[in-house]
Amino acid sequence: NYIPKGYEIPSDVDYFHCTSNNTIYGTQMKEFPNSTTLMVCDMSSDIFSRRIDVSRFDIIYAGAQKNMGPAGTTLVIVKDEVLGKTGRNIPTMLDYNTHISKDSMFNTPPVFPIYVSMLTLQWLKNLGGVEVIEKMNQEKADLLYAEIDRNPLFEGTVAKEDRSNMNVCFLLNDSSKEDAFNTLWNAAGISGIKGHRSVGGYRASLYNAMPIESVQVLIDMMKKLEQN
């Protein structure tokens, strides 16, 4: 329920790997460690949701299925100087150089997911880019977290400074009201907010495409449960 802080990355490691946003626990790295070692980051669940200094990382990879398009494609940003430095033999298919040299068409590409990702990025650009969507995502998350903190029936599960803007995880304090709450949000047309099976509770995913109006519907149902 929190992001570790104050740690040092040993200088003799080959690389440091982190995941910028944890979808299961609802934590998100707001700052990244300074290190001279090779930095690798999985940004699958918050890529293009906020501004990031890409130059700080040697490799960034992200599955498309959260903020870019349908599942089946992966975006990779890699610095030229780290290519070919595996120090061991790896399968041709797993070598980034293979895909770079073939313009990402070493094998038959999944055309539809790539096409939809293009449309999504065009939509984001026309919206005003990452800076604009970052503000919109912050507004959505702030609204929902404010209700979680205000409403005595609900409780956040993550340290406030580490709360994710993409995956808002929370608990219902009164288990006797669980059926009533589930009925409310189901009737309101909300789906998929049950928490991950390993942690339970609830999880509202606020990815780029989620409009603020939908977040407000969930908040209204939380208030309605309180009134009942």
Report the location of each language-model feature:
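A short linear hydrophobic-aromatic micro-motif
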Residues: 153-157, 189-195
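Conserved active-site segment immediately N-terminal to the catalytic lysine
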Residues: 40, 54-65
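Active-site phosphate-binding strand-loop segment of PLP-dependent enzymes
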Residues: 1-47
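Short beta-strand-to-loop capping motifs
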Residues: 78, 170-174, 206-208
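Active-site C-terminal subdomain of aminotransferase-like
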Residues: 64-145, 159, 228
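Conserved PLP-binding catalytic core of the aspartate aminotransferase-like
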Residues: 154-184
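PLP-dependent enzyme catalytic core of the Aspartate aminotransferase-like
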Residues: 187, 196, 200-228
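A short secondary-structure junction signal
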Residues: 2-5, 26-31, 49-55, 71-74, ...
